[in-house]
Amino acid sequence: MDGSQLGVSRRDFLRAAGVAGALGVSGSLLGARAALGHGGEDHGADHKAGHGAADSGGMAAHGGNGTVGDVDLSRFDPSKFLREFYWGEERTEGGRTVREYELSAEAVEVEVAPGVMYPAWAYNGQVPGPTLRAREGDLLRVVFRNRDAHPHTIHFHGFHPAGMDGVFELVAPGQEFVYEFDAEPFGCHLYHCHVMPLKKHIEKGLYGAFVIDPREGREEADELVMVMNGFDTNFDGANEVYAVNTVAFHHQRHPVELKLGELVRIYVVNVLEFDFVNSFHTHANFFDYYPTGTRLEPSEFTDTKMFAQGERGIMEFSYDFPGLFMFHAHVSEFAELGWMGLFDVKE
């Protein structure tokens, strides 16, 4: 039984689940909330006691918010995904670089919190799909195979011919399509399915980041990819779980390791459905922000950035002090439901 059948709003669900969790109640309606380890609404005392007392896993750092247990990281590991880039198979044709990628759409179960499985549609069996990467001016060839029971496509943000737009050329189950276009403009982009109902095809997981480097390159940095997403686990048209790279609170349990003083570059993409905006906030630090990454000079120096759906950009910063530093959505509900993590800065 889902929340819509019970006539329960998302916020009613959130309020009730804390009480039910304390009483040991389980079930599909309460499973996501219970896995996220929430208790009652008043976390004030825990919050004050928790700060400055983070353990190595970061779980004591914020009043007990976090998951109970861990997901099966052999299925999908957000920590590995952070620094994985799919450059494709590179060859030279007619004096220019050609990159060929292979993507497939298929139905998979994704673990978004410990024991909470979500029936997803995914590119190459993972949510988000692989982070595609190329250099400005490369010729890209993407072989797409549909291994699902529904028609799907790939729509790439960027420049390409009309026939490569992934809107009208539906790929039927068991069929394939080859997208071919030049890698431009440089920047931080995304790709996603564009079959109607569009909301369903995106929120079920058919999306990924798409990075094009400028011809002259960028300054060397520790590069990360963070795709901000959410999951409607009871199918009521509202998210119960929020995350960076799919798994709630993953980077609170497994902090992102950074080196003191080293330049960090994060490619941030927002694909959140059902909510108008998302956000990214860094504690004890500011970052240079490059909207869509299509300019080589930052537009602002800030510690909080708002993102509409499909909006993306590049954040650059370094830390002057070692230790654990929080980052999270500055929409409090999102942070409490999984979109929260830690940077572990080491000398």
Annotate each language-model stretch with its function.
Residues 1-12, 16-27, 36:
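N-terminal secretory signal peptides
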Residues 23-25, 29, 33-151, 160-162, ...:
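N-terminal, post-signal-peptide metal-ligating segments of extracellular/periplasmic oxidoreductases
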Residues 141-143, 147-221, 302-347:
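Extracellular/periplasmic metallocenter environments
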Residues 150, 199-200, 274-277, 288:
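Short beta-strands and strand-coil junctions in structured, solvent-facing domains, enriched
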Residues 156-159, 273, 280-287:
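Short acidic, flexible loop segments centered on an aromatic residue
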Residues 162-165, 285-295:
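Short aromatic-acidic-glycine turn motif
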Residues 218, 224-233:
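Surface-exposed beta-loop interaction hotspot
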Residues 294-303:
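Solvent-exposed, glycine/polar-rich loop segments of beta-barrel outer-membrane systems
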